[in-house]
Amino acid sequence: MSEIVKSMRQITKENEGIQVYVFMSRAAQQVLRLYGLTKDLENVSNKIFLEIDANRTEPFYYLPGALQVGKFKLFLICPATANTVAKIVNGIADTLITNAAAQAAKANVPIYIYPVDSAEDNLTTTLPDGSKLQLTMRKIDIENARRLSTMENFNVFTNIAVLKEIIDNHP
């Protein structure tokens, strides 16, 4: 998570005038708090919206509609949980992010997505207290990430380093 926020900070410094809107669930808000990243994220985004349901945020913004009418040049889902990826590949649009992804795909808005559970190897993650945790990737999550990469208008990336390139390609 910290690598994503760090990369966003770098991108906003290098791209004067870039508009970054963050849309997140309450669970994402909790994770950011646990890792002490809330202030950092506030510093790199123009506005943060918290999901109320599949169509509404607080403060109010209708993201799916904004994507459909071309208010955004791209839709970046970073990170995407295994649950979000599974819903997208199965056509379930019952959260703000999955609904927005479905609408963006229909409107041919480029979607870039970073599925956190896509590597075939086990993963070591750092917990909020600094300790390490070894995670074993589930085959179903790896398969869903692979399926996502074959879907129209979805561009899957597995390395945070390409975020800058993605933004640079959509001025």
Q: Where are the regions that the model predicts?
A:
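A cross-family phosphate/adenosyl-ligand binding-site feature
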Residues: M1-P171
